[in-house]
């Protein structure tokens, strides 16, 4: 079934400029709808980890993009929160039974789009989760945090207030941004452009990470890009230019996570009861 979906999506992608709500074939509509529904239920995800490496399923991302070509804008929601969009909100038709079955908490006015997956014991404070995103169990998405399109958030992650996790749809990115299990992302930090923050890492308040951000390891003196090693404690910093005339922002790995760090950033099970 998945192979058939992929074949249909890939073929439709080649002629995407000609797709519209009026003339798309039933086969393409069904393939895209089935893929979005599978993303919504967590049966499919844009990226998953296999043998220690993240594998990105580009065809699923293409299905998400194609879905925007196949839908007209429509009025949704109720006053005073009325919207006009192509993508329905995830909880539009939910009643008490559906929320209990999902096992998560959604604090008004949090919004998750249909096609995003929310795991059990997740808490969505007034925040935003975009289509294609995967938020695994036990994670806290704090107030005004945003989880971008197709971003992958692991188990027991804390996204602090105002955190931005970048999406892939605009500007178009090859790979999703990934925050692995048991990470703590400090307030107002931004992780974008497919950067991977490996498990058990802590980002301090105001850390900005893109593919071009230098990640300086204080212990080794090495500079890397695009990936924070497992168990790192990262703070914002700067590195001087070769001629000493100026400095540019960077992220600094100051140490590895220890018991003291973990005590300061541990999740509160009382909030997930």
From Swiss-Prot:
Q: So what family is this one in?
A: Belongs to the transferase hexapeptide repeat family.
Binding sites annotated in the UniProt record for substrate: 105, 142
Q: List its EC numbers.
A: 2.3.1.117
Record's keyword annotation contains Amino-acid biosynthesis: yes
Give the GO cellular component terms, alphabetically. cytoplasm
Q: Which CDD domains match?
A: LbH_THP_succinylT
GO MF assignments: 2,3,4,5-tetrahydropyridine-2,6-dicarboxylate N-succinyltransferase activity; nucleotidyltransferase activity
Q: Does the keyword Transmembrane helix apply?
A: no
Name the NCBIfam families for this protein. dapD (TIGR00965), PRK11830.1 (NF008808)
Xref: InterPro entries: DapD_Trfase_Hexpep_rpt_fam, Hexapep, Hexapep_transf_CS, THP_succinylTrfase_dom1, THP_succinylTrfase_N_sf, Trimer_LpxA-like_sf
The protein, known as: 2,3,4,5-tetrahydropyridine-2,6-dicarboxylate N-succinyltransferase
Quaternary structure, per UniProt, is: Homotrimer.
Which GO BP terms apply?
A: diaminopimelate biosynthetic process; lysine biosynthetic process via diaminopimelate
Q: Which UniProt keywords apply?
A: Acyltransferase, Amino-acid biosynthesis, Cytoplasm, Diaminopimelate biosynthesis, Lysine biosynthesis, Repeat, Transferase
The record, for PANTHER family, names: 2,3,4,5-TETRAHYDROPYRIDINE-2,6-DICARBOXYLATE N-SUCCINYLTRANSFERASE, MOLYBDENUM COFACTOR GUANYLYLTRANSFERASE
Gene3D superfamilies on file: Hexapeptide repeat proteins, Tetrahydrodipicolinate-N-succinyltransferase, N-terminal domain
SUPFAM superfamilies per the UniProt record, alphabetical: Trimeric LpxA-like enzymes
Task: Provide the primary localization.
Answer: cytoplasm
């Amino acid at each position: 079934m998945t192979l058939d979906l992929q074949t249909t999506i890939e073929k439709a992608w080649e002629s995407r400029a000609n797709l519209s709500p009026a003339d798309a074939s039933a086969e393409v509509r069904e393939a895209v709808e089935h893929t979005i529904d599978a993303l919504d239920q967590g049966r499919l995800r844009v990226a998953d980890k296999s043998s220690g490496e993240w594998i990105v399923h580009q065809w699923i991302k293409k299905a998400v993009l194609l879905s925007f070509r196949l839908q007209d804008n429509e009025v949704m929601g109720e006053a005073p929160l009325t919207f006009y969009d192509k993508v329905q909100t995830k909880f539009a038709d939910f009643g008490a039974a559906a929320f209990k079955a999902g096992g998560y908490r959604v604090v008004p006015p949090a919004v998750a789009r249909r096609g995003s997956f929310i795991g059990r014991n997740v808490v969505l404070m007034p925040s935003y989760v975009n289509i294609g995103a995967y938020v695994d169990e036990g994670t806290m998405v704090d107030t005004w945090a945003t989880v971008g399109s197709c971003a992958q958030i692991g188990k027991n992650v804390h996204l602090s207030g105002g955190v931005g996790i970048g999406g892939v749809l605009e500007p178009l990115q090859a790979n999703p941004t990934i925050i692995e299990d048991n990470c703590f992302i400090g307030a107002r930090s931004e992780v974008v452009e497919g950067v991977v923050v490996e498990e058990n890492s802590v980002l301090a308040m105001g850390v900005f990470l893109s593919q071009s951000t230098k990640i300086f390891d204080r212990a080794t003196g090495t500079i890397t890009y695009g990936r924070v090693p497992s168990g790192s404690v990262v703070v914002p910093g700067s590195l001087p230019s070769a001629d000493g005339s100026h400095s540019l922002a960077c992220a600094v790995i100051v140490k590895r996570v220890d018991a003291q760090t973990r005590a300061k950033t541990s999740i509160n099970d009382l909030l997930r009861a």
